[in-house]
Amino acid sequence: MRPWRHIDGRFLYLPASQDVWNQLRARLQLAQRLSGTAIWVPHPGAIGIGVDVDLPIGGFVDVLLLPRDTTQWPLEGTQMEFYIWWIDEYPQIRLLPADPRHRREDFDEWISSQNGPAAAAFRTHHSA
């Protein structure tokens, strides 16, 4: 069952059980590429976007990884590629758009100054 569900005119996030998440998480890695569809863009510029990645756990792109210019945000229904940005105990996959047009405008500069595991994995997998 898909985690993003449209109920009474709004999207709800109802992920699979923690056991399912633990099994799935063991097969995922930072900077891994996934295909997905933007299905929830509630308030451009405020929160981020919900993404259906065809798994029992949903994806989410945080507002801090998206362009400041909200006209560059993907629209609901946009199919695109993502990189896994973060995975932890909470059953949700944090994502980074693979297409630079859908990332924050200063992404290249910003990523070089980040010290976390997601940034390190991205730099390792995407260094020239």
Locate predicted features.
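Single-stranded RNA-binding regions, centering on S1/OB-family and related RNA-binding modules
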Residues: M1-A128
